[in-house]
């Protein structure tokens, strides 16, 4: 991630959402200067079911997003480097929905009022068991041109807990310093900090760094920077002094629906 970032630190961002607006820092209907909503639908395929079975519902998903007027964007993430271990499988896939917090309120009301949408959810339930998690996201960096150039990307996620002897203001100051160094000198496309809210469970009080990469070359350029470019010391300082983190997982992501607002 953060190639050449202030002594080289690494780790953050999801693909925000952005179609350039000449007057505000906005992308795909979201003001990136404000916290926005991110919903994670974490899914485990049922025995005998595959991602191909779920993909057969994709056209209906797109139709209903249009029909119900959802001002939201939807990506499907499948594991590339997951935390899953033998006997402890990771999620089969995660559907990530992004938009303004207000759009989630209107969107859920419209979705649940649609008989076809309820029918679609029932069809999905026959293929996978899913749980919904709603979070807020703070965009730190969005390379708009790069984000708009492709519907596919790799996304890293790293869950962290603030160290007890560090205040939230001190942690924010650290992130501010990274952002200042990162914005114009990075091989990744986006960095968001995610704050779990509804359905958070034991993730309450934690935060997640999400970073988006255009391809594996960008991802491995960051890994090379960590290994050979001097970033390891800065990462070690962050982990020991500021936050205890689980380590990064990496997911392959593709848009199912893009809000063009």
PLM-predicted stretches and their roles:
Residues 13-18:
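N-terminal signal peptide c-region/cleavage motif recognized by signal peptidases
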